[in-house]
């Protein structure tokens, strides 16, 4: 599956879920499903990053392995699409450039950028955040048990009307204590990742001896 895959045109929006997915886990899947249920979107577009400007060391697994894991995790699931555009750019993954690409692909579809509250807290460090806000709606994940997202960081970047729309696009989901870094540590120390990642993904990780200490 790649960016060349087409989806039916409609007036529904498109959810954008970017990340390293190193590895993809059930928390990511729950985020996407919650977005599908709560936002006016037709599908969630998973966009694995090459190298994040805020994570300059880059992913641990190769691009191909991360794509393989995503394909296995999303196989047969409706409303979930993989877009490898950022990987094919062979450069740092800036959200603004990805949004410009998606606007060219889907000029009449509103874009919803799905981010966590932690990403919102550092939004002022993103490249040209004001331009990002002109090209998409932010949809912030609010996890039960966590402090509510702090939208004050957006003050001065856009007007109050858009900030209110962003608040209304907030996605509710339970708190899930799973992270890719914890999973990599569990694998490196010989602990189980069962039920934390889809079974086919766990099988691939084991077969390819990924994330093991060398």
Swiss-Prot record:
Q: Which Pfam family, any one, appears in the UniProt record?
A: CTP_transf_like
InterPro entries linked to this entry: Cyt_trans-like, NadD/NMNAT, Rossmann-like_a/b/a_fold
The GO molecular function terms of this record are: ATP binding; nicotinamide-nucleotide adenylyltransferase activity; nicotinate-nucleotide adenylyltransferase activity
Which pathway does it serve? Cofactor biosynthesis; NAD(+) biosynthesis; deamido-NAD(+) from nicotinate D-ribonucleotide: step 1/1
- Enzyme class, top EC level, equals transferase
- One example of a Gene Ontology biological process annotation: NAD biosynthetic process
This protein's UniProt keywords: ATP-binding, NAD, Nucleotide-binding, Nucleotidyltransferase, Pyridine nucleotide biosynthesis, Transferase
Identify its protein family.
Belongs to the NadD family.
- The name under which this protein is listed is Probable nicotinate-nucleotide adenylyltransferase
> Source species, please?
Rhodopirellula baltica (strain DSM 10527 / NCIMB 13988 / SH1)
| Lineage of the organism | Bacteria, Pseudomonadati, Planctomycetota, Planctomycetia, Pirellulales
